[in-house]
UniProtKB/Swiss-Prot annotation:
This is Striatin-4. WD repeats lie at residues 436-475, 489-528, 542-581, 587-628, 635-674, 677-716, 723-753. Part of the core of STRIPAK complexes composed of PP2A catalytic and scaffolding subunits, the striatins (PP2A regulatory subunits), the striatin-associated proteins MOB4, STRIP1 and STRIP2, PDCD10 and members of the STE20 kinases, such as STK24 and STK26. Interacts with CTTNBP2NL. Its main location: cytoplasm. PROSITE patterns: WD_REPEATS_1, WD_REPEATS_2, WD_REPEATS_REGION. The modification Phosphoserine is found at S53, S206, S276. SMART domains: WD40. InterPro entries: G-protein_beta_WD-40_rep, Striatin_N, WD40/YVTN_repeat-like_dom_sf, WD40_repeat_CS, WD40_repeat_dom_sf, WD40_rpt, WD_repeat_striatin.
């Protein structure tokens, strides 16, 4: 009985825990379920463990806690899925927005860069136009003025010349440009008066000559025909004079149109302009014009007083500084080639006047007339070249001649250097670039008579260059030269080189403490010839450390060397042994020597510089120091990198680490001059054989040429690049040719002409 009640309770509990719509009948565990009434109306559910489905007429099931929980879980899962899809779409849209923003920013940067490039090109174009304008006309172009460029106008049909001809803006700009030219060349009122008198003399004064009465401004003007030519020409003279004065003085009347003036000049109807040759910017502008003869009776000039003519010529000749050089002292005066009053002179004056007026028209910016000549005019004269202001002083002075002015061209590699004393006044340009070394070049030496150079490098080699065997790499580029011989014997960097007597031998010193004597091979040798062991003559041994400086005296046939071991030695290079003649121990008193040189005025004296800033003069015959030069500056001792001697004077020049160059008197030891020469340490010096100029090199990558007369810099050349905070190591001047050379830490040597 108890078991049946427990089974019924379990069945009731199980039925209450089923979800909505399940109508299975409970039964004992392990037994077949018995039929139970369905929760809702309708037929009873069938047994077998499965609940019977409600019938077609079943109504809504009542809510239960499990059903509510199931619904909430289902809705929560659907919400999470939609949220995940929304997050994915949001991330995708954000990525797309970021991509579009990046594209927009990139386009803005590109636009900014293009605008910057356009402005840069516009600026470069303005600079080129100003340069071309200055070369062509000799005056600086005013960037504020806008010039009408007809050639740049693109149109599908023919350009109407009437539009530009009647434009007041073109007239105004042309007058302003002419006024600027006249003011810049000193074309004052006095010169204008002289020019007015000359125009009168060329045209003829109609009032006095022809006896005609000049019409007033209100009276109608006579046409430029045979009947009314006298009055018209006198009025033309007056209008031309007023126009010239207005252009120069800058009055308010300069803005008026001058069409009425040019309309009465019949010989301007057939002017034809030809463009100048664009291939040569320095050619003067040539205008070929066809002239039309005027009746000679209206152009008979009045015979002016000779004194007035001379005064005019003297006044105008004061401004004869624009000549191209063709009208020298021996050039004939075209105004005095014929007898006064002859038909040839009248014709020449008439042609000059026509050229003046035609060129005034060209400067004003007017296009040439395209209409034919008026009926009844004679045949035009053959064209001839006439420039503006042709009649100033009767010479060939013109704005076109300003184009003949020359400027220094950096790409022009040729320079007339026949006079070595005046060579420093010229511009030195790079011509040869020597590129065969693999490390910095420490020293240079020129051949005494040939165009050959010897270089010593830290790569352990010396190389001989024949500068006459140059190969052009490209147009307007420095010439490349290949070495004809490489000297190899040093065990380490080669630090110094010196050329022997007559350039038969050369000497090199290196970090291996050895001095090698070399025989110079034939300069015409083939670089690919076999090795000649006789090139190495012998070795001078005696130093205990690196040899930093060498100097050879052709007078005494002695070789001087300075070493890091603290000694200065004098050698007889022609002797096999013992080659060392004397030794000057300097380490205890002055320190380590850095450079040595022979004095030109006293062949038995040498001068040595030291790291301590001292400069000592030695006597080879006595074997002792003569004088210690006062080479230390006021700021304290600084290392001296090189010492050289003036070729004609008892003067020693030193290059210091404190950017200075000092000039010392060998007789007194006092400093003669001191100057700050570079922006960095001065490393090397060279004096030309005539003593006219000094060349200095520095770690600021610049070469500077100094006039020894006034100690001023006449030229600066940037030739080398820095490497390990070092730039230029050595400079040299050719003893007999107009050549200079420099060597640097960039493993390049450059030759200048």
């Amino acid at each position: 009985m108890m078991e049946e009640r427990a089974a019924a309770a379990v069945a009731a509990a199980a039925s209450s825990c089923r979800p909505l719509g399940s109508g299975a009948g409970p039964g004992p565990t392990g037994a077949a379920p018995v039929s139970a009434p369905a929760p809702g109306p309708g037929p009873a559910g069938k047994g077998g463990g499965g609940g019977g489905s409600p019938g077609p007429t079943a109504g809504p099931e009542p809510l239960s806690l499990p059903g509510i929980l199931h619904f909430i879980q289902h809705e929560w899962a659907r919400f999470e899925a939609e949220k995940a899809r929304w997050e994915a779409e949001r991330a995708e849209l954000q990525a797309q927005v970021a991509f579009l923003q990046g594209e927009r920013k990139g386009q803005e940067n590109l636009k900014t860069d293009l605008v910057r490039r356009i402005k840069m090109l516009e600026y470069a174009l303005k600079q080129e136009r100003a340069k071309y304008h200055k070369l062509k006309f000799g005056t600086d172009l005013n960037q504020g003025e806008k010039k009408a460029d007809v050639s740049e106008q693109v149109s599908n049909g023919p350009v109407e010349s009437v539009t530009l001809e009647n434009s007041p803006l073109v007239w105004k700009e042309g007058r302003q440009l002419l006024r600027q030219y006249l003011e810049e060349v000193g074309y004052t009122d006095t010169i204008l008066d002289m020019r007015s008198k000359r125009v009168r003399s060329l045209l003829g004064r109609s009032l006095e000559l022809n006896g005609a009465v000049e019409p007033s401004e209100g009276a109608p003007r006579a046409p430029p025909g045979p009947a009314g030519l006298s009055g018209g020409e006198s009025l033309l003279v007056k209008q031309i004079e007023e126009q010239i004065k207005r252009n120069a003085a800058g009055k308010d009347g300069k803005e008026r149109l001058g069409g009425s003036v040019l309309g009465q000049i019949p010989f301007l109807q057939n002017c034809e302009d030809e463009d100048s040759d664009e291939d040569d910017e320095l050619d003067s502008v040539q205008h070929k014009k066809q002239r039309v003869k005027l009746p000679s009776k209206a152009l008979v000039p009045e015979m002016e007083d000779e004194d007035e003519e001379d005064d005019s010529e003297d006044a105008i000749n004061e401004f004869d500084f624009l000549g191209s050089g063709e009208d020298g002292e021996g050039a004939p005066d075209p105004r005095r080639c014929t007898v006064d009053g002859s038909p040839h002179e009248l014709e020449s004056r008439r042609v000059k006047l026509q050229g003046i007026l035609a060129d005034l028209r060209d400067v004003d910016g007017l296009p040439p007339k395209v209409t034919g000549p008026p009926p009844g005019t004679p045949q035009p004269r053959p064209h001839e070249d006439v420039f503006i202001m042709d009649t100033i002083g009767g010479g060939e002075v013109s704005l076109g001649d300003l184009a003949d002015l020359t400027v220094t061209n950096d790409n022009d590699l040729s320079c007339d250097l026949s006079d070595s004393k005046d060579a420093f006044k010229k511009t030195w340009n790079p011509k040869f670039t020597l590129r065969s070394h693999y490390d910095g070049i420490r020293s240079l030496a020129f051949h005494h008579s040939q165009s050959a150079l010897l270089t010593a490098s830290e790569d352990g080699t010396l190389k001989l260059w024949n500068l006459q065997k140059a190969v052009t790499a490209k147009k307007n580029a420095a010439l490349d030269v290949e070495p004809i011989h490489a000297f190899r014997a040093h065990r380490g960097p080669v630090l110094a080189v010196a050329m022997g007597s007559n350039s038969e031998y050369c000497y090199s010193g290196g970090a291996d403490a050895c001095i090698h004597s070399w025989k110079i091979p034939d300069l015409s040798m083939d670089p690919y010839d076999g090795y000649d062991p006789s090139v190495l003559s012998h070795v001078l041994e005696g130093h205990g450390d690196a040899v930093w400086g060498l100097a050879f005296s052709p007078t005494s046939q002695r070789l001087a060397s300075c070493s890091a071991d603290g000694t200065v030695r004098i050698w007889d290079p022609s002797s096999s042994s013992p080659a060392c003649l004397c030794t000057f121990p300097t380490a205890s008193e002055h320190g380590v020597p850095t450079s040595v040189a022979f004095t030109s005025t006293e062949p038995a004296h040498i001068v040595a510089s030291f790291r301590s800033g001292d400069t000592v003069l030695y006597d080879m015959e006595v074997g002792s120091a003569l004088l210690t030069l006062e080479s230390r500056g006021s700021s304290g001792p600084t290392q001296i990198n090189q010492v050289v001697s003036h070729p004609n004077q008892p003067l020693t020049i030193t290059a210091h680490d404190d950017r200075g160059i000092r000039f010392l008197d060998n007789r007194t030891g006092k400093p003669v001059h001191s100057m700050v020469a570079h922006l960095d340490a001065v490393t090397c010096l060279a004096v030309d054989p005539n003593g006219a100029f000094l060349m200095s090199g520095s770690h600021d990558c610049s070469l500077r040429l100094w006039s020894l007369d006034n100690k001023t810099c006449v030229q600066e050349i940037t030739a080398h690049r820095k490497k390990h905070e070092e730039a230029i190591h050595a400079v040299a001047c050719h003893p007999s040719k107009a050549l200079i050379a420099s060597a640097g830490a960039d493993a390049l040597a450059k030759v200048f002409v």
